[in-house]
Swiss-Prot record:
PANTHER family: HUNTINGTIN-ASSOCIATED PROTEIN 1, TRAFFICKING KINESIN-BINDING PROTEIN. Its main location: cytoplasm. Residues 153-320 are annotated as: Sufficient for interaction with KIF5B. Residues 32-44 have a biased composition (Pro residues). It comes from Rattus norvegicus (Rat). Residues 158-262, 474-583 are annotated as: Interaction with TBP. Residues 237-249, 388-399, 606-623 have a biased composition (Basic and acidic residues). Residues 1-12, 52-62 have a biased composition (Polar residues). It is found in: Cytoplasm; Presynapse; Cytoplasm, Cytoskeleton; Cell projection, Dendritic spine. The keyword Repressor does not apply. Pfam families: HAP1_N. This is Huntingtin-associated protein 1. The lineage of its organism: Eukaryota, Metazoa, Chordata, Craniata, Vertebrata. In the brain, especially in the olfactory bulb and in the brain stem. No detectable expression in peripheral tissues such as lung, testis, spleen, and small intestine. Self-associates. Interacts with HTT/huntingtin; enhanced by an expanded polyglutamine repeat within HTT. Isoform A interacts with ITPR1 and APP. Isoform A interacts with AR; decreased by an expanded polyglutamine repeat within AR.
Amino acid sequence: MRPKDQVQSSAGDGTGSGDPATGTPTTQPAADPAPEPSAEPKPAPAQGTGSGQKSGSRTKTGGSFCRSRIRGDSDAPWTRYIFQGPYGPRATGLGTGRAEGIWKTPAAYIGRRPGVSGPERAAFIRELQEALCPNPLPRKKITEDDIKVMLYLLEEKERDLNTAARIGQSLVKQNSVLMEENNKLETMLGSAREEILHLRKQVNLRDDLLQLYSDSDDDEEDEEDEEEEEGEEEEREGQRDQDQQHDHPYGAPKPPPKAETLHHCPQLEALKQKLKLLEEENDHLREEASHLDNLEDKEQMLILECVEQFSEASQQMAELSEVLVLRLEGYERQQKEITQLQAEITKLQQRCQSYGAQTEKLQQQLASEKGVHPESLRAGSHMQDYGSRPRERQEDGKSHRQRSSMPAGSVTHYGYSVPLDALPSFPETLAEELRTSLRKFITDPAYFMERCDTRCREERKKEQGTMPPPPVQDLKPPEDFEAPEELVPEEELGAIEEVGTAEDGPAEETEQASEETEAWEEVEPEVDEATRMNVVVSALEASGLGPSHLDMKYVLQQLSNWQDAHSKRQQKQKVVPKDSPAPQQQTNMGGGIVEQQPIVPTQDSQRLEEDRATHSPSAREEEGPSGAT
């Protein structure tokens, strides 16, 4: 048999000697060509030099391997593993039967050989594991407590990691803040260093200047001392020369003068030049300072002037503001006045428009009345023709009426029938002319005088005890008054009038014709517009008809009544003195009792035209609707 060398694994490491991987192989000497298959394992020391009781306890529980390599005929070395441990007879299988092939197989050669495939290598490794650990330890089951413990440990580690991360973030922030502060401090340090260098330079320059000044002062003092000494020596020499001349007055040689000692100092010259420059700069600076002082004085003067001007301007602004306030108030007043004037202007414009419309209407009416005027003149001339009848018939009619007159206070009814064939036509122009003549006739001033006389007469009669019939005070009828034409039909009224005419006889007809002619000659009074309107309105209301329904028979009857009253007044004027008032006459006006008055003397047709021309169209416009009421 070949001798073998066993290499025992040392347990000197601090990790313990029980681990199979801790075995250290030892090289076999060259004399051993192959390992011995039936080699028995020898016990190896379980303790290492450096391990204590802990490593010794591990050697009791675990085993150790001893590996010996034997160099044989093959290129790769052979390795033999010897298991040493507490397994006892269970480890005897490593050296018998199944393990002999493993020990003899060159493992390194199998790993290096290129022909060996992956499955072969895996099978070899599996067999090796089975040979090394034929009876593995049973696996320990993991319980829920172990899982909870592990989870708790993991949570603690996560908490530690989170806290470490937070601490790291805070440290990073602090580090960034400190870095910024450090940068600021570095910049401040750099600026401070620059200032220090600048100050050092200035200090060095000042030291140099002070040293130069001190050196120059020392040199000047030395020069002054030397000059004083030289002056004293010269005085002494001069005295000696004088003494020698006294001793040797003639031909005495004069001693040569001593050369003056010259002190050449380049720093002194540089300092002098610098001093000159500094003096020049100082003078220049003084001039500039004086100039600046002058400028400051001028600036102060200008500032004072500006302040004065500003105060004046502020005063002017205050005055202007007051003026502006006053003007604004005036402007507001003017605006109010303007608004008022505009309102008045609008009102006046509206009035002007209304007046313009009225003037247009009046112009139209005037044009229409101008067209009607010649027809009315023709009708008036035709009626004047009736006045050319003899006065005798009129006087006869008057006498006949006096004989057949009624007693005082009675009402006389006259029924006249004028032949309508005597008139050429009965247009509306004739009705208008009759209305105007009626207005003028009724609104005579003598009518109002007669009314006053009647009142006085009534008062006298009351004193005497006689009660006269009540006169009519107003021309307007009462509200509940009804015209006779409305109460009695026209046919019956005509029949009554015809009866009256039949009783009077033909004499009354002749008297009526004469009275009509006389009335048309004498009816032209000048009356007031308002009085005329009232009378016409009362006449039309008494008739109960409008201007368009004016009855010619009724109008002619009124004219005849007025003519009769006029003739009676004329007769009374002949009998009664001029100072006495005219008697009162009452006639029937179609059912209404109207007081009559003396008539103004007649005028020609030209006066009638002038009177019509003087009347404004507005009065005529007012007369039209008043007559319609």
